[in-house]
């Protein structure tokens, strides 16, 4: 008479089972956080010295494209000496009707240190070519053709850049760049032609961030 061998039941190690369940749960939590996470600029309160005067939504200067990453700050100059922050903001806004070009910036810093926010930090601005998708842009007014900022404008640029770096955990030396560093355009003019002044500006930003 043939004997049927009884199959030996393998006991599941309860500790191993717990570890597997914990790992699965952790992966689910990470997935849900990624799916539900907000944009990096969402809920960020602007400094008191910034006036929010956002452009109308339009395909030429404020397309409304979500800014899903903030990996840097790009500094520009406006290129039209003696003009105010408000004038440059209005120019960007007018592109909705003129269709002259695609251009804008998140911020414009004026000749008297005033700052206008033109595009929310949750949206892409048309300023820095391929880096539009992951940077915040600052256009800076200047009094003359040299492109050098006035003292009050310079201090505000330093202050605003330091705030952005602190808010979005950016490295000043690596993540604060010129328009020139993206496209080779001579912008901001003075700080391309005087690289030592550019290095000093970044050093001043770092000093502003120091506790």
Regions found by a protein language model. Name each.
Residues 2, 8, 12-18, 31-51, ...:
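Basic/polar, cationic surfaces and motifs that engage anionic cell-wall
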Residues 2-128:
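N-terminal catalytic cores of peptidoglycan-degrading enzymes
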Residues 74, 108, 137-139, 177:
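Soluble periplasmic/extracytoplasmic beta-strand elements of cell-envelope proteins
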Residues 79, 131, 136-145:
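Cell-envelope and extracellular/periplasmic
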Residues 92-98, 126-128, 135-138, 155-159, ...:
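Short, low-complexity, polar/charged sequence segments that are solvent-exposed and flexible
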Residues 127-129, 185-186:
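Short acidic/His/Gly/Ser-rich catalytic and metal-binding motifs that mark active-site loops
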């Amino acid at each position: 008479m043939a004997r049927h061998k009884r199959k030996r039941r393998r006991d599941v190690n309860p500790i191993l089972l717990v570890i597997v369940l914990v790992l699965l749960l952790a992966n689910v939590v990470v997935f849900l956080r990624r799916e539900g996470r907000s944009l990096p600029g969402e809920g960020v309160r602007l400094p008191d010295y910034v006036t929010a005067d956002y452009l109308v939504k339009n395909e030429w200067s404020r397309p409304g494209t979500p800014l899903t990453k903030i990996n840097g700050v790009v500094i520009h100059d406006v290129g039209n000496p003696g003009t105010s922050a408000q004038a440059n903001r209005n120019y960007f806004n007018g592109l909705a009707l003129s269709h002259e070009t695609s251009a804008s910036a998140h911020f414009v810093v004026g000749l008297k240190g005033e700052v206008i926010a033109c595009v929310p930090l949750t949206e892409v601005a048309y300023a820095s070519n391929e880096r539009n998708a992951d940077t915040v842009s600052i256009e800076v007014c200047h009094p003359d053709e040299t492109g050098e900022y006035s003292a009050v404008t310079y201090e505000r640029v330093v202050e605003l850049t330091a705030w952005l770096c602190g808010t979005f955990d950016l490295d000043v030396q690596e993540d604060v760049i010129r328009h020139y560093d993206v496209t080779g355009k001579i912008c901001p003019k003075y700080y391309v032609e005087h690289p030592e002044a550019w290095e000093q500006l970044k050093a001043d930003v770092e000093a502003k961030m120091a506790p």
